[in-house]
Amino acid sequence: VAGLPIHRLLGTCRSRVPAYPSSHWLDIPEAYAEQALHYRSLGWTAYKIHPHGSPKEDVEICRAVREATGDSIALMLDPMWSYSYEEALRVGRAVEEMGFFWYEDPLAEDDIYGYVKLRQKLDIPILATEYTPGSLYGMAEFVIRQATDILRGDVAVKGGITPLVKIAHLAEAFR
């Protein structure tokens, strides 16, 4: 349309946006640490960890990456809906102590009550989920109930650019 990129059609408000690489599942904590160091050597300033889903092992992975990188990059943890509330709280406290930037999707995507409790107990920002039941309306419920600190949208999951614009407006309205 009009020969313009989408960001221009939507009314560009930034000249740059932060980005980060994410891990895939690696065999051992040291492999995550090596991957984070590799990305840092390429100029990345943040790294998101997708661990195995076992709380004890996941904390070991996070610790290995933090020890390898020091405070030179922002770290985020996304265990992809792997934990019970008690496990999520325990892991959340551990990554909070390690200075992680955010904690994403620790609980099932429909556990709003668990996310509310987790947010009340932890200081680390909670990012709950791009897979909310009910799409935009599910995200609104997370915001209204204060179950998340950060909204995340995925164009492939949410149904295109228009739903993402609506999510951005929702986030802006409840800033």
Question: Across the structure, where does each feature detected by a protein language model lie?
Answer:
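Conserved beta-strand positions in the central sheet of alpha/beta enzyme cores
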Residues: 46-48, 104, 152
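N-terminal capping/lid subdomain adjacent to the active-site entrance of alpha/beta enzymes
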Residues: 1-76, 80-97, 121
